[in-house]
């Protein structure tokens, strides 16, 4: 019966997520990672953190496919999906939870709709964290493998770094207490190399390079609506119950109690001082709770009563996340392919791109199946703010009076006046109420 439940759940999960992956069109964050992997080499790989705020592992995995311009977007989305699929299999095979809780986690919004579909660096960080949970009880028997998993998890994203580094510190602390220091020295050497690679990337980090870094302070409303789609007051009460319940039940397992407190404080501090975070970032708090309960159950340092209480809390939290569909449209309907197709149809026009559409459509345009001259796009000087970069826009539009400007808002664009020159915008096409494409004419 246990195997039947697993196969039913996993087959349903595979079908739903693969259908989502097939029809998913990447957003800016996804396509931008592809462009970074395409344009960088191993020597400057660590510099990507200054633009993205995440570490190099995801770009390293994408690099062979991006440089060959092979199979976009499916080579990228299937790599991402494979890591999430492996995480689900590991959960079902090794997690000390009952089948009901495993099913709830499997079909929660993060694991059914977000992480397996949106190809970012987060899914590849969940797998090593789950594998660390599997090895945690026997970490002293397999210290090198455990250490390498920590290093890999730390280099996937800053969020996964905060969620895994303390698990590595726990290993070093336990190895140091042993009489034979050989394993401690080996793992300390691995930790030193990992610290060096992380340090190189952090030293390259600059909040000035991240536009979102200017948004200081985490969004309380976003945080309160991350786990449950209810009234904000009810959300706050439920989150308070979850916080008290998890802390009380995990208190006797000092390491897992410290782990949960550290990760929550570190991630929320990151959102406070660097960037505000969004729902996919806050979902890693959910991953942290799953991991902490997983390890606490295996370590057997808490009572059976606490285990039951934690199971009920995780079931309730996972159940509420199943109905979290408020981000359905924003996650799955970027329509970047439709915009790219429109650009191809007008390949002889000079184009101006506003906001993030240039990078979102670029991999589709550079698909090797068209005679489109990509230099026409590259010569548009990338992303503009109409108000601030008027002179640059005028310079690029001057050779051709009829041009197209792409924006990701359907709001009416006013005519702009600079000296004796007027830019007039005429709506040419509306793509699924997400993008307006305007003809631009310059009058002197």
Q: Model-predicted segments: where are they?
A:
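Short periplasmic/luminal acceptor-recognition loop of GT-C membrane glycosyltransferases, typified by
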Residues: 328-337, 345-393, 399-414
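Transmembrane-helix motifs of polytopic, lipid-linked glycan transferases
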Residues: 7-11, 78-100, 247
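Aromatic/acidic, Gly/Pro-rich catalytic loop(s) in extracytoplasmic/lumenal soluble domains
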Residues: 393-444
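Short acidic/glycine- and proline-prone juxtamembrane loop motifs at membrane-interface regions
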Residues: 117-123
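Transmembrane-helix signature of polytopic, membrane-embedded enzymes
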Residues: 3-6, 91-111, 126-127
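Signature aromatic-anchored transmembrane alpha helix within multi-pass, membrane-resident enzymes
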Residues: 6-9, 189-192, 241, 300-323
């Amino acid at each position: 019966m246990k195997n039947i439940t697993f196969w039913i759940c996993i087959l349903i999960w595979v079908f739903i997520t693969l259908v989502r992956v097939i029809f998913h069109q990447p957003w800016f964050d996804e396509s931008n990672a592809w462009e970074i992997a395409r344009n960088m080499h191993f020597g400057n790989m660590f510099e990507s953190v200054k633009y993205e705020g995440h570490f190099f592992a995801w770009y390293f995995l994408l690099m062979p496919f991006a440089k060959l311009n092979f199979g976009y977007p499916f080579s990228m989305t299937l790599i991402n999906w494979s890591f999430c699929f492996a995480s689900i299999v590991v959960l079902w095979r090794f997690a000390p939870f009952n089948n009901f809780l495993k099913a709830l986690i499997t079909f929660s919004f993060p694991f059914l709709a977000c992480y397996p579909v949106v190809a970012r660096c987060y899914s590849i960080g969940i797998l090593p964290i789950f594998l660390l949970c599997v090895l945690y009880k026997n970490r002293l028997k397999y210290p090198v493998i455990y250490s390498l998993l920590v290093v890999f998890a730390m280099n996937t994203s800053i969020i996964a770094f905060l969620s895994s580094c303390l698990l590595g510190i726990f290993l070093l602390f336990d190895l140091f207490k042993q009489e034979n220091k050989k394993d401690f020295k080996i793992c300390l050497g691995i930790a030193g190399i990992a610290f060096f690679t992380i340090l190189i990337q952090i030293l390259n980090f600059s909040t000035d390079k991240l536009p979102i870094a200017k948004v200081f302070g985490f969004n309380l409303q976003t945080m309160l609506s991350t786990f449950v789609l209810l009234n904000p007051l009810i959300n706050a009460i439920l989150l308070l119950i979850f916080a008290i319940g998890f802390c009380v039940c995990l208190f006797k397992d000092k390491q897992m109690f410290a782990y949960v407190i550290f990760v929550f404080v570190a991630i929320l501090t990151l959102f406070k001082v660097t960037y505000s975070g969004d729902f996919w970032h806050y979902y890693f708090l959910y991953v942290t709770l799953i991991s902490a309960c997983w390890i606490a159950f295996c370590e057997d340092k808490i009572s059976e009563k606490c285990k039951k209480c934690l199971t009920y809390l995780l079931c309730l939290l996972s159940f509420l996340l199943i109905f979290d569909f408020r981000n359905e449209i924003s996650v799955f309907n970027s329509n970047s392919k439709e915009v790219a197709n429109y650009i191809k149809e007008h390949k002889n026009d000079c184009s101006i791109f506003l906001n993030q559409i240039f990078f979102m459509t670029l991999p589709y345009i550079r698909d090797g199946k068209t005679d489109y001259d990509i230099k026409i796009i590259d010569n548009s000087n990338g992303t503009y703010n109409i108000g601030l970069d008027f002179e640059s826009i005028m310079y690029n539009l001057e050779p051709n009076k009829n041009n197209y400007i792409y924006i990701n808002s359907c709001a009416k664009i006013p005519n702009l006046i600079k000296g004796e020159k007027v830019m007039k915008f005429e709506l040419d096409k509306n793509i699924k109420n997400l993008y307006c494409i305007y003809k631009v004419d310059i009058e002197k």
